[in-house]
A protein has these predicted regions:
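Structured catalytic core of nucleotide-sugar glycosyltransferases
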Residues: 1-130
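Residue-level signature of catalytic and energy-coupling elements of molecular machines
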Residues: 5, 23, 79, 94, ...
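Short conserved micro-motifs on helix faces and helix-strand junctions that flank
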Residues: 8, 66-68, 159, 232, ...
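Alpha-helical hydrophobic/aromatic positions enriched in membrane-embedded helices and signal peptides
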Residues: 32-33, 37, 86, 154, ...
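Acceptor/aglycone-binding surface of glycosyltransferases and processive sugar-polymer synthases
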Residues: 64-68, 72-82, 87, 99-182, ...
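Hydrophobic helical membrane-anchoring modules
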Residues: 178-314
Length: 314
């Protein structure tokens, strides 16, 4: 049996050599054959040069180079489309996700004898700040309710799965891909696997707080119509509030004979309605933009080159 490990790489020149070394030492001693599908996501450092040298020396390494940076989601799908083993895995190149855990997850999947289709890793102890941890927890809770999908809380893209799951993931044609939502949407039987991430070998994480927030919004917009329902609810609440205010105003004038000053209240109402309208238009625009981009049917990525070993692995 063979497992194909898909490894997205972006500016990982300081990590890829050690990653391949560790991964090879782990799987060379295992009962499985393996292949490392290293996807260079338009790196602007020497990542591709390092990967090319590794591919020429190691028959288990295959390299896919993008024409530019298309993002991790595109890198993952490119690697999965190149995968043909009985099992596939997604793992980062910075060794925070250990190859030893990938092997343990594979063994759990194989030994389940069909009981599970996927083993998904989640962080048992998080090393992030309290704020980011809480924000991620809130996101998973909102996403699970809004998208009606059972996403494993704090699960990463680090997982091992069968060819059937891989084919199901590849079959989804959308351009705006949100892997955590896709993994949850395709379903199958998933076994959670707790792990503690190691310290990053070299460099810094590519994820900032702003990029995490943007990624969360992408997930919500890609997998649920909750924001559109929010617009509907906002319109209903605003209409009810306006009717109540009109009723109270008429009551004060006709019954109590009060002179209701209108300038300040009118200004507040106009600003409130204007803000609600702009918010609604913005949400509708986000969905319309996605329809527009999906209609273009552009490829998720463009491959500049592929590199395989000149040495046979037979």
């Amino acid at each position: 049996m063979r497992i194909d490990l898909v490894v997205p790489c972006f500016n990982e020149e300081d990590n890829v050599d050690e990653f391949v070394k560790v991964c090879s030492s782990v799987f060379d001693e295992s009962e499985f054959s393996y292949r490392l599908i290293m996807v260079d996501d338009g790196s602007n450092d020497a990542t591709f040069s390092h990967l090319t040298d590794l591919a020429h020396k190691n028959p288990c390494v295959e390299v896919i180079q993008f024409s530019r940076n298309f993002g991790k989601e595109a890198a993952m799908i490119a690697g999965l489309e190149a995968s043909s083993g009985e099992y596939s895995a997604i793992i980062d190149a910075d060794l925070q996700q250990r190859p030893e855990d990938a092997l343990a997850m594979l063994r759990i999947l194989v030994q389940s004898e069909g009981e599970y289709d996927c083993v998904a890793a989640y962080q048992e102890k998080r090393k992030e700040s309290w704020l980011i941890t809480k924000m991620k927890g809130m996101f998973y809770s909102i996403f699970a309710k809004a998208a009606r999908s059972q996403a494993i809380p704090h699960a990463s893209d680090f997982r091992v799965f069968t060819a059937t799951v891989r084919d199901a993931i590849i079959s989804l044609p959308e351009s705006y891909r949100f892997s955590k939502g896709i993994f949850a949407w395709v379903g199958f039987r998933v076994k959670p696997y707790a792990y503690v991430p190691s310290d990053r070998l070299q460099g810094e994480s590519k994820w900032s707080l702003s990029s995490l927030i943007r990624y969360a919004f992408e997930g919500i917009l890609s997998f649920t119509t909750l924001p559109l329902r929010f617009v509907t609810y906002l319109g209903a609440v605003t209409s009810i509030g306006a009717l109540l205010y009109a009723f109270i105003t008429v009551l004060q004038i006709l019954v109590f004979g009060k002179d209701v000053p209108g300038y300040a209240s009118t200004l507040v109402v106009v600003l409130l309605l204007g803000g609600a309208q702009l918010l609604s238009i913005g949400i509708l625009g986000e969905y319309l933009a996605r329809v527009y981009m999906e209609g273009k049917q552009r490829p998720l990525y463009i491959v500049r080159s592929r590199v395989c070993s000149e040495v046979s692995d037979e």
